[in-house]
């Protein structure tokens, strides 16, 4: 296993870091992995710190910014007796209450580090949004499922503005109103006619300003097209410090609910399909979807495989 070392100096911006401060060092092991992929160098990269004890909120954010992955997750002891561990999730810009690929990746670490007994098939993670249920489906490597938090449907968005913001023609869009749907992170879902339009779409900050007001919470934008196997999609998150995300579990639950609502996929309990994401950016990801609830709106599970990549130690001079 490749092992790396990163040294970061944390100091007050108004004070110089003196040599004597170098005696106060804390070391923190971290793991990197590719989530929603069965092979390395695909899927969505993630860093997980198995023991974040003693790392402050500010330093967690600094670490996430330094690593500059879509998200970095930090594991700590739970405050709830029914949860295996507590998880904090940070993008390079902010902390998230919930995110899909960090939840799947952290669950893989929980299994590998034996935070739960070997052979455990179900457990709960404590996240800021609340308890998140995890289910493990045995395979050559485990297929890990998360129960999507409660989904809410928000405002509709003008198709002309959506097309303009994404660099498309309004005729490229499906005849279904784009809509904000949330399972913790509000996501504007825009359906287009085929994969070519998905790959042509792009979102800059100027385009984002057409889609939301400044007082709204940060918005993800998902562009998708229905496929024989489910969906083909891209997700843009400039407000989260992520221009394009290779795999977005927190947006895939809302996508599934949106597709069921608009009769693009069956809402019958037990329905399974996939969302293929990240292809355009060379990080092909496969997100598995299973519908377990009435009309597919609740009881949605998102599943994926995890490929471990590297292990390292971060030394913080504090």
Question: Which role does the model predict for each range below?
Answer:
Residues 3-21:
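Short, Lys/Arg-enriched N-terminal segments with co-localized hydrophobic residues
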Residues 19-98, 104-318:
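Active-site proximal loop and beta-alpha junction motif in alpha/beta enzyme cores
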């Amino acid at each position: 296993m490749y092992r790396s070392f990163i040294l970061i100096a944390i100091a007050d911006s108004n004070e110089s870091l003196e040599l004597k401060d170098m005696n106060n060092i804390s070391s923190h092991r971290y793991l990197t992995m590719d989530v929603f992929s069965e092979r390395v160098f695909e899927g969505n990269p993630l860093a997980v710190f198995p023991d974040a004890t003693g790392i402050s909120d500010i330093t967690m954010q600094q670490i996430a910014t330094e690593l500059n992955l879509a998200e970095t997750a930090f594991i700590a002891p739970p405050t709830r007796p029914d949860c295996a561990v507590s998880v904090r999730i940070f993008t390079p810009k902010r902390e998230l209450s919930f995110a899909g690929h960090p939840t799947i990746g952290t669950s893989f670490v929980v299994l590998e580090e034996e935070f739960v007994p070997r052979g455990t098939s179900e457990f709960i993670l404590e996240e800021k949004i609340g308890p998140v249920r995890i289910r493990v489906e045995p395979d050559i490597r485990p297929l890990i499922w998360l129960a999507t938090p409660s989904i809410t449907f928000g405002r509709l968005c003008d198709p002309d503005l959506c097309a303009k913001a994404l660099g498309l023609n309004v005729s490229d869009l499906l005849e279904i109103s784009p809509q904000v749907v949330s399972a913790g992170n509000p996501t504007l879902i825009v359906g287009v006619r085929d994969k070519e339009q998905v790959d042509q779409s792009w979102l800059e900050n100027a385009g984002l300003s057409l889609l939301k007001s400044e007082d709204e919470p940060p918005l993800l934008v998902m562009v998708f097209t229905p496929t024989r196997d489910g969906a083909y999609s891209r997700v843009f998150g400039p407000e989260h410090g992520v221009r394009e995300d290779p795999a977005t579990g927190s947006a895939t639950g809302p996508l599934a609910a949106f597709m069921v609502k608009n009769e693009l996929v069956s809402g019958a309990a037990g329905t399974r399909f996939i969302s293929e994401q990240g292809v355009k950016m060379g990080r092909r990801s496969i997100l598995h979807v299973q519908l377990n609830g009435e009309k597919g709106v609740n009881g949605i599970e998102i599943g994926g495989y995890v490929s471990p990549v590297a292990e390292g130690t971060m030394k913080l001079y504090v």
